[in-house]
Amino acid sequence: MKVNHSFLLLFLITLFCACTPKNIYYSTFSTTAIANKGMGVYVLRVQGIGQTYQQAKEDAMRKAVYDIIFKNVSSSYGEHRMIQPVLSNPLTEQQHADFFGSFFSAGGDYLKFVHELRLEKDKFKPQARRGVIMNVVVNRAALAKYLADNQIF
């Protein structure tokens, strides 16, 4: 009888622990250009989220390249101009889904056009999902040439 109660108690404790809320971070942080290095090279401040620190860094670099290709990126330097997206047609991503799927895959070609400048801050505790806000350098001109060479318009 004691064994049954022990198993029941252990089961209930496990069940209650599994039902506790998870620490998931949602943010409205937007990618911002903080410097223009000339020749189509920009320094961006971007946020990445992942289960590990390395995944969060990779997510940030992927997001920086994605935003340069598809979105207007606001600028916090000089005359506060927007950086126009490389591709202005919003349907291009859907039309070339296979290309962009492999381009943005882990270890994909997007890494040729971005590198970390320096880590800004690590905002999350080890037991939670990790997030980083970091500065990255994106070569927009080389990225535009690469997309044109692959006939992505």
Predicted regions, residues:
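Bacterial N-terminal signal peptides that target proteins for export
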Residues: 1-8
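A generic signature of intrinsically disordered, low-complexity regions enriched in glycine/proline
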Residues: 8-9, 71
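Bacterial N-terminal signal peptides
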Residues: 9-15
